Amino acid sequence: FITVH
């Protein structure tokens, strides 16, 4: 799972 803000 990759989260980019």
From Swiss-Prot:
UniProt subcellular location: Secreted
Q: Which UniProt keywords apply?
A: Amidation, Amphibian defense peptide, Secreted
Q: Which residues carry this modification: Histidine amide?
A: H5
Please describe the organ and tissue distribution of this protein's expression. Expressed by the skin glands.
- GO CC annotations on file: extracellular region
What GO biological process, any one, is recorded here?
defense response
> This chain belongs to which protein, by name?
Electrin-4
